[in-house]
Amino acid sequence: MTGKAGEALSKPKSETVAKSTSGGAPARCTGFGIQEILGLNKEPPSSHPRAALDGLAPGHLLAARSVLSPAGVGSMGLLGPGGLPGFYTQPTFLEVLSDPQSVHLQPLGRASGPLDTSQTASSDSEDVSSSDRKMSKSALNQTKKRKKRRHRTIFTSYQLEELEKAFNEAHYPDVYAREMLAMKTELPEDRIQVWFQNRRAKWRKREKCWGRSSVMAEYGLYGAMVRHSIPLPESILKSAKDGIMDSCAPWLLGMHKKSLEAAAESGRKPEVERQALPKLDKMEQEERAPEAQAAISQEELRENSIAALRAKAQEHSTKVLGTVSGPDSLARNAEKPEEEDATEEDRPAEKLSPPQLEDMA
């Protein structure tokens, strides 16, 4: 052996380690991995110099990585920070453990210290408590929803018939109609009101396709036409030949039919009145005939009485004129009653029969 080789062999390992640590650290080539892009491999500013890490024996590094890797026998959860050998508890080894070798080693390196483990435990407990709260809230909401849910009302055929009849008559029944339906069908009024709401929605959905066109019949132009007794289009009237209920707009046609009937009745009324007028005239004439006769007789009596009064007035006027004409007329008038008295005295007494004489006696 040469002298240089012997000196190298005689030197202790500690000196060689110190020399190696005192030298510059070899540059690592960084790839374009996820950790490098996200900056997970950046070292904190308070970390120890990397020169001491490079001086650690490669066997120790392999042992630590084999223990921390998923394929290894143990793990940090099983061994814990106190379960590793004593030389692994040095600060240089802790920095090696904190160096992220892969993605799955990063959270384990952060939880290396006892303080970190306590923090993670507290965060886990908080997560569990928050999840429990969420579960309890969701359970309460579900129970509330279940309580609010109502059972579906099952209608009998009789009830449906009565409700459909009422719906054909009026889509919006008033309070009195709802009360009558409640008495007939033995249903509460709120159920009847809900049924009418659902039935109107169903009717609107069906009537949107009415006439294969645009507008609903009840609230559109055709409803106004019916209200003002304007004739409907022929396409609508033709659909009513098979029956109003089988047509495209049963409620509209029913309303149109009612308006036509009302118009026909209003047209018949003047004709009936005209026909009834001559009959009434005849009846009135017959009834007024005795009244007219009585009125005529009364008029005749009045006329007769007036004529008699006039005759008496003329007689009185002639008498007055006679008295005014001269005293001769007065003397004549005075002589006349004397003559009459004389004539009565000069008349011969009539012969009385014996029974009359007896009666006089």
UniProtKB/Swiss-Prot annotation:
Using the record's annotation, list all stretches that form the CVC domain. 208-261
Q: Please list where the region (Disordered) is annotated.
A: 1-28, 104-151, 262-361
Q: Which GO terms describe its cellular component?
A: cytoplasm; nucleus
Locate the motif OAR. 304-317
Alphabetized, the UniProt keywords read:
Activator, Developmental protein, DNA-binding, Homeobox, Nucleus, Repressor, Sensory transduction, Transcription, Transcription regulation, Vision
Name the tissues where it is expressed. Expressed in the retina (at protein level). Expressed throughout the anterior optic vesicle and all neuroblasts of the optic cup (at protein level). In the mature and postnatal retina is restricted to the inner nuclear layer, in which its expression decreases from the outer to the inner margin (at protein level). Also detected in regions of the developing thalamus, hindbrain, and ventral spinal cord.
The observed outcome of changing R200Q is: Loss of DNA binding activity; mice are microphthalmic but viable with defects in retinal morphology and pigmentation as a result of delayed retinal neurogenesis. Reduction in transcription repression activity
Basic and acidic residues: bias regions: 266-290
The annotated phenotype of a deletion mutant is:
RNAi-mediated knockdown in the retina of newborn mice results in an increase in the number of photoreceptor cells as a result of a decrease in the number of bipolar cells and a comparable increase in rod cells at postnatal day 21.
Subcellular location, in the record's words?
A: Nucleus
Q: Does the keyword section mention DNA-binding?
A: yes
Instruction: Indicate the impact reported for R227W.
Output: Reduction in DNA binding activity; mice are microphthalmic but viable with severe defects in retinal morphology and extensive pigmentation as a result of a lack of retinal neurogenesis
User: What are the DNA-binding region positions?
Assistant: 148-207
According to its UniProt entry, one GO biological process term is: cell population proliferation
Q: What does this protein do?
A: Acts as a transcriptional regulator through binding to DNA at the consensus sequence 5'-[TC]TAATT[AG][AG]-3' upstream of gene promoters. Plays a significant role in the specification and morphogenesis of the sensory retina. May play a role in specification of V2a interneurons during spinal cord development. Mediates differentiation of V2a interneurons by repression of motor neuron gene transcription, via competitively binding to response elements that are activated by the ISL1-LHX3 complex, such as VSX1 and MNX1.
**Disorder named in the UniProt entry:** Defects in Vsx2 are the cause of ocular retardation (OR(J)), a mouse disease characterized by microphthalmia, progressive destruction of the retina, and absence of the optic nerve. The OR(J) mutation is due to an OCHR (STOP) mutation.
Could you say which protein family the record assigns here?
Belongs to the paired homeobox family.
Oligomer status and interactors: Interacts with MITF.
State what protein this is by name. Answer: Visual system homeobox 2
Identify the taxonomic lineage of the organism of origin: Eukaryota, Metazoa, Chordata, Craniata, Vertebrata
